[in-house]
Amino acid sequence: METISITNRGSIRKFVDDVFIDTIENIYALCDLKISYYGVSIAYKNTGQLKKYKRGKILHNYLSNNELERINFFSVPDDFVTVAYDYLLSISINYKNNFMTATFDKNIINHECIEEIKTLLDTFMEKAYMQEIYTMDKEETPLLYAMGIKSDFKTIKILSSEAVKEDYV
């Protein structure tokens, strides 16, 4: 199954208010999806378990934790088997390694919304940063490419790669 990913590499702003969640939910809404699950990683804690998505105090506490290393959001169909391969949209924000990536199942992304999605993702980034848009097979795990862990992918196709600089007034 082919995916389209938008990956931003650079310093990520940390939000602890509703603006963070509103922005993430808006990206999902542009694809007519809702967040199903989320997962967090906090330094020195074993928090690798996925949780059913719900706005509220628990999620807010994770977001406001100074030790938050990364947070991932997933939308999956009702009949999913494995979140890692059955997601329709995954957004991963990695504060520890300074990148965020949104990976869309190619069948659900509305191509007219890509610019709006890029703008929403931009709100999380400190300028300047690098932005890449690429396609690849979901089974090759696009997150591994975004993390820079692996580079020998058979199906990757870079659509764009650019430096996003300060807006000068």
Positions of predicted regions on the chain:
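Glycine-rich, often proline-containing surface loops adjacent to acidic residues and nearby aromatics
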Residues: M1-T7, L88-I108
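Residue-identity detector for threonine
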Residues: T3, T7, T23, T47, ...
